[in-house]
């Protein structure tokens, strides 16, 4: 967590700043960033190299999409491994591009927010132009990584990139920017499905794909609202909109609504494509239990030995496990 902001200089406005005291930026002294050349550190910080959980968050819908498609149509394990490797590269590059774009667009807001004011563009370590060039390079490399996949993957990838570019502007005009962010990640379900030959947006699979995409979108909204609660005070002062701000007095109700909507979407998906009991046990039941546990931790401090992050990870693991079990038990494990 960054330190507090400095007092205003003489002759400046008498308005109380959002952050009253500010300590100067301190270069990293531990972790992966401390091992890099000093000139590389701002760019590594820009792509959140020291925060890999963001990569996991973006990567998991790709894997869910692969297993969703493979539970419906046979896919060799070697093909799944190849696609998973490609999407790991795509995720790393496009997540970095998204972070760089977001920080460039949000730099004025970041300077007013305690948690964000030492980000490289906000503190002046990287210029606006350098940030845009870096974003473009990462984006081009990302699309180069998926060129061996069916052309539909590129089409969906363009849509994903457009949604990602829109996201930071959404926080200025709507309280539901998290829905844009969630839709960005949800679009990767179709991307992954097309990569293994399932026509995800065709008439036969459009509704099931939509149900799973809605699930991913709602999971991202759930996670992002939990994460954004820490910035609610600063966001109210600086005028940043968001669901954590809009529903700040009704967060438990919002979480409950999201959880029920996810359970309903997954149940509908399972019915439409004929999923078996493993899917309902893990992907529906286990996921729902994980999210309910997270709400309980948030409000009533139930299960004090567990963090809310563990509950969320448990929920995601169950979602994936249900698809894996369906894939395995339907004798789709071919070409081992």
Swiss-Prot record:
Factors inducing expression? Expression is induced on AF medium.
> What InterPro entries does the database record attribute to this sequence?
Prenyltransferase (IPR039653), UbiA_prenyltransferase (IPR000537), UbiA_sf (IPR044878)
What family is reported?
Belongs to the UbiA prenyltransferase family.
Q: Does the keyword Membrane apply?
A: yes
Topological type in the membrane: Multi-pass membrane protein
EC number in record: 2.5.1.-
**Which pathway does the database say it acts in?**
Secondary metabolite biosynthesis; terpenoid biosynthesis
The cofactors required by this protein are:
Mg(2+)
Span list, region Disordered: 1-26
Query: What broad class of enzyme is this?
Result: transferase
Q: Example GO biological process term?
A: terpenoid biosynthetic process
One GO MF annotation is: 4-hydroxybenzoate polyprenyltransferase activity
Q: Where are the transmembrane segments?
A: 52-72, 74-94, 131-151, 179-199, 206-226, 251-271, 272-292, 314-334
This chain's protein is named Prenytransferase ascA
Q: Which reaction does it catalyse?
A: orsellinate + (2E,6E)-farnesyl diphosphate = ilicicolinate B + diphosphate
Q: Which gene encodes it?
A: ascA
PANTHER family hit by this protein: 4-HYDROXYBENZOATE POLYPRENYLTRANSFERASE, MITOCHONDRIAL, PRENYLTRANSFERASES
For this record, an example GO cellular component is: mitochondrial inner membrane
Functional description taken from the UniProt entry: Prenytransferase; part of the asc-1 gene cluster that mediates the biosynthesis of both ascochlorin and ascofuranone, a strong inhibitor of cyanide-insensitive alternative oxidases and a promising drug candidate against African trypanosomiasis. The first step in the pathway is performed by the non-reducing polyketide synthase ascC that produces orsellinic acid by condensing acetyl-CoA with 3 malonyl-CoA units. Orsellinic acid is then prenylated by the prenyltransferase ascA to yield ilicicolinic acid B. Ilicicolinic acid B is further reduced to ilicicolin B by the reductase ascB.
Give the species. Answer: Acremonium egyptiacum (Oospora egyptiaca)
Lineage summary: Eukaryota, Fungi, Dikarya, Ascomycota, Pezizomycotina
Q: Which keywords does this Swiss-Prot/TrEMBL entry list?
A: Magnesium, Membrane, Transferase, Transmembrane, Transmembrane helix
């Amino acid at each position: 967590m960054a330190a507090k902001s400095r007092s205003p200089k003489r002759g400046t406005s008498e308005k109380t700043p959002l952050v009253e005291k500010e300590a100067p930026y301190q270069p990293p002294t531990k972790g992966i960033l401390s091992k890099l050349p000093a000139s590389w550190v701002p760019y590594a910080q820009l792509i959140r190299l020291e925060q890999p959980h963001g990569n996991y968050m973006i990567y998991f819908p790709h894997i869910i999409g692969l297993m969703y498609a493979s539970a419906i149509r046979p896919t060799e394990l070697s093909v799944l491994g190849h696609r998973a490797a490609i999407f790991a590269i795509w995720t790393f590059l496009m997540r970095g591009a998204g972070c760089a774009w977001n920080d460039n667009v949000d730099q004025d807001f970041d300077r007013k927010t305690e948690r964000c004011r030492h980000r490289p563009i906000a503190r002046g370590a990287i210029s606006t132009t350098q940030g845009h060039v870096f974003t473009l390079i990462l984006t081009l490399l990302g699309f180069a990584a998926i060129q061996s996949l069916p052309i539909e993957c590129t089409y969906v990838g363009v849509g994903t990139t457009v949604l990602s570019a829109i996201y930071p502007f959404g926080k200025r005009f709507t309280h539901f920017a998290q829905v844009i962010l969630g839709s960005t990640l949800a679009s990767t379900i179709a991307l992954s499905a097309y990569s293994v030959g399932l026509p995800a947006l065709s008439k036969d699979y459009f509704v099931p794909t939509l149900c799973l995409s809605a699930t991913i979108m709602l999971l991202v909204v759930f996670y992002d609202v939990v994460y954004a609660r820490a910035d609610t005070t600063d966001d109210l002062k600086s005028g940043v909109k968001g669901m954590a701000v809009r529903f700040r007095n009704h967060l438990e109700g919002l979480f409950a609504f999201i959880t029920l909507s996810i359970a309903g979407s997954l149940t509908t998906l399972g019915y439409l494509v004929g999923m078996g009991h493993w899917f309902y046990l893990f992907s529906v039941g286990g996921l729902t239990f994980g999210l309910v546990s997270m709400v309980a931790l948030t409000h009533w401090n139930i299960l004090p030995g567990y963090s809310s992050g563990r509950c969320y990870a448990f929920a995601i693991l169950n979602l994936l496990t249900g698809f894996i079990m369906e894939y395995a038990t339907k004798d789709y494990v071919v070409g081992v």
